[in-house]
Amino acid sequence: MITVVKNGRVIDPYNNIDSKLNIVIKDGKILEITPYEISGEKNIDATGLIVCPGFIDIHMHEDMYHNEEDYLDEWIAKSMLNMGVTTCIGGNCGINLTEPLTYLDAVDRLKLPVNIGLMAGHTNIRECVVENSNKYNPIQTDDIKKIMYTAREYLEGGCFGISYGIRYVPGITELELIEVSKACKPENKIINAHVRDDAKNIIWATKEFIKVGMKLDIPIQNSHIGSMGGYGQMKELLRLLDSVK
């Protein structure tokens, strides 16, 4: 079936488009974007509306699967769609609300009206595989290896990368960050983090995390630049991030 979205303001920053245009869609794929009048089997009047690629929310925490009832929180996904978000990335800040492979399996089976990606949360892995772990204390090398192997299993199972909540697990050492992140190296997957500190120490904390990515030559993402943490330091912080892109 041919669907035409008509008379909308089409905004596509990637292709430098901002114009009133008509979009021709067939089987879920765009066939044509044209300024000329055209009709299809189904016509959607977008007069006064913006038509654009779906937004990607790279930082969500709503990756909950209700095992006993076997359902996902579809209302959250629908709320995201209402805001124009079509792809969501969960499992951030080191936290998974559901065991990653269980959640990904549920997404495949039950479906959601948005695309879902998932990070493997370091904090949850640490708590599960390290006996009597204490978030305030460093852990032994053998335990670090256990975390890395489990993270690798999750990455091979479909997770996009590893997330860290360094601020919430202050016992994480540089060695632990580097060794666990090696699981991302084979497929050049990403690591992201809520860094170790904020406010006056935000620059130092960001540099600590950047060092991990540079040492392993893998992509990184700084999950947050807090408004108060960046106050008076934002230009310096953005220059730092730009310098290592």
Across the structure, where does each feature detected by a protein language model lie?
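Active-site neighborhood of phospho(di)ester-bond hydrolases with catalytic His/Asp-centered motifs
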Residues: 52-59, 89-92, 119, 190-195, ...
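Short loop/turn motifs at secondary-structure junctions and domain boundaries
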Residues: 12-16, 69-70, 142-144
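Histidine/acidic residue-rich metal-binding segments in metalloenzymes
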Residues: 138-164, 169-245
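Divalent-metal coordination cores built from histidine and acidic residues
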Residues: 60, 72-163, 184
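Short coil/turn connectors at secondary-structure junctions
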Residues: 1-2, 39-41, 47, 51, ...
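N-terminal metal-binding scaffold of metallo-dependent hydrolase/deaminase domains
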Residues: 1-39
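Divalent metal-coordination and catalytic microenvironments
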Residues: 8, 23, 28, 48, ...
